[in-house]
Amino acid sequence: MDPVATHSCHLLQQLHEQRIQGLLCDCMLVVKGVCFKAHKNVLAAFSQYFRSLFQNSSSQKNDVFHLDVKNVSGIGQILDFMYTSHLDLNQDNIQVMLDTAQCLQVQNVLSLCHTFLKSATVVQPPGMPCNSTLSLQSTLTPDATCVISENYPPHLLQECSADAQQNKTLDESHPHASPSVNRHHSAGEISKQAPDTSDGSCTELPFKQPNYYYKLRNFYSKQYHKHAAGPSQERVVEQPFAFSTSTDLTTVESQPCAVSHSECILESPEHLPSNFLAQPVNDSAPHPESDATCQQPVKQMRLKKAIHLKKLNFLKSQKYAEQVSEPKSDDGLTKRLESASKNTLEKASSQSAEEKESEEVVSCENFNCISETERPEDPAALEDQSQTLQSQRQYACELCGKPFKHPSNLELHKRSHTGEKPFECNICGKHFSQAGNLQTHLRRHSGEKPYICEICGKRFAASGDVQRHIIIHSGEKPHLCDICGRGFSNFSNLKEHKKTHTADKVFTCDECGKSFNMQRKLVKHRIRHTGERPYSCSACGKCFGGSGDLRRHVRTHTGEKPYTCEICNKCFTRSAVLRRHKKMHCKAGDESPDVLEELSQAIETSDLEKSQSSDSFSQDTSVTLMPVSVKLPVHPVENSVAEFDSHSGGSYCKLRSMIQPHGVSDQEKLSLDPGKLAKPQMQQTQPQAYAYSDVDTPAGGEPLQADGMAMIRSSLAALDNHGGDPLGSRASSTTYRNSEGQFFSSMTLWGLAMKTLQNENELDQ
């Protein structure tokens, strides 16, 4: 190979591997939430759109570009084409690829799409089905132009090219030698059509496109490196393509026919002529010398389509086996095979033994086509064959019996039983059972997060993390704990939570012997012994042992309070504080109806312990008339505080306004009693003429009874025991307010005032 071509192939191969691993990529394309990493130089080299985009956004920092492309697979295939020169075009994706290439202005892809569309609109022969031309030339069309040039060593390429030129000369001199297109028609149509007509139909194919589009393809493609040492059976698959390139028509114009012939075997039986099923793949040998010359390089030839062809052929053969398993179709198929075998035996006799053997391997083993040598004789054989094909679809595990459709999936499943983890991280030494898990793990070391949440813009290293994260925005918690009923957004968190209910503590600390039921708790505990604090705050430099501790600390700088109380809308920085706060709401709601009941019980208890005389009541009159500005200590219950401020304050104002006009007469009466002279004038009471009807009555409207009197006596005694200082000094001191007893409701204070007035009347008598 040319040194320049080798150098360019190696360069593009390395760039492609870097893109797959996500290394040294300087831009990211986001299409509907799916991220594609690539190199700007490669994108700009193939696309005029990307070239202008990168030049105009040179000052952009993040290098993330959101593309308005309708189909995600279109951009993915175009990126693969840029790095591998490989593009799969078929009837399903041709329109998508054409639209995407026009949007991104990729001229090479546009040329390939137009060439594909031209080949699909070729004038068909009379007997050909309408969809046969397009289907036969669609899947492997791009490979046809590079079949000769891309896989051979230089000396073999020269030899094959010389043979091809010789074949071209022979074909021009003998136009009736190779009617390769006639094999696509029925036996009756072959007899009616002239041989030069078939040649003309094949030469009219406008499929002459340059080879330089595909010369670099297999040198660095994944399949080339992955299956370079594959079994010989896969190599035989490409032999029909190679035989046709050297035998059919001209060098360039025969290649579409060869590809179409190989694809024709993949078609379902109803679209194929009757004589085609039993006919060998290459039943015509226009020139024996050309076959012998190119047979050697054919065996070394490898097409990238081999894997896809085998999979598609297998599915087609299954469908065919199911159809021919019916009795009616069995008879018809046998008749067609017998009639077709008569026409093909004469052609097959001219071939050598080696050619026959290779053709049988290709037609029977790889393409699963029923040839003349393997034609079933009875319906029972067809049924056995269909059962064999059905059994091949399932690969069962020997240990648990779980079925799989592909052996590779079965191989991965077996590792779950054996515990084999062949993939090792070269950074931390952790092992994985699958290569994809290792690749995701490596992103955590490099910090790469290619997956983005479309709602909040948060980035993740794995696609599964995005799916689990999206549930947070919806607030849905479908996974419930069957023990405590707590809900979780994903199953892994629920599984971790269930370990808290188990009493088994299998994780033990080696240093102190403390056990834990979860491994993460043990890891966090070990940090206390080592003193390691790997997480540091970028704002203040403080270090922490866990990442969660660092996140909570950062909230002190940002002021973020993500946890909100649903009752009072108060926000908190930690979820534990929110849970304690919610318990306060529940406790307050349970205790508020029982406040008065607790107070009444306390008053009755104190009444039984103490019995007061009339003299004690006269001594306790000093606490009855407090200034309006003095307030009793506030109880934690807010409802009681409001009741005291609104109701009792008005009662005291009314009492003072009625007592003050009688101060002079009361002073004369108190002068007769030396024990009363020491009391201040503020404590003087009104005479007997006081009208009870002017004082506010309780809500019930009933006067105080004997039970109310007992309650008042105990309350006054409790107030008197707090100290012997005058009321004025006690009211103004902070210590007195802090050491004050229970809070009394407004009804109790009203009762105290009424009893004081009654005691004064008794003293006057």
From Swiss-Prot:
Q: Which GO terms describe its cellular component?
A: cytoplasm; cytosol; microtubule cytoskeleton; nucleoplasm; nucleus
Q: Which SMART domains does its entry note? A: BTB, ZnF_C2H2
Q: Which Pfam families match?
A: BTB (PF00651), zf-C2H2 (PF00096), zf-C2H2_6 (PF13912)
Ranges for region Disordered? 165-203, 275-294
Q: Which UniProt keywords apply?
A: Activator, Cell cycle, Cytoplasm, DNA-binding, Metal-binding, Nucleus, Repeat, Transcription, Transcription regulation, Zinc, Zinc-finger
Induction: what does the entry report?
Answer: Induced by the DNA-damaging agent etoposide. This induction is mediated by TP53 at the transcriptional level.
Q: Name one GO molecular function term.
A: RNA polymerase II cis-regulatory region sequence-specific DNA binding
Q: What family is this?
A: Belongs to the krueppel C2H2-type zinc-finger protein family.
Please give the function described in this protein's UniProt entry: Transcription factor. Inhibits cell proliferation by activating either CDKN1A/p21 transcription or RB1 transcription.
- What protein does this entry describe? Zinc finger and BTB domain-containing protein 49
Per the UniProt record, the source organism is Homo sapiens (Human)
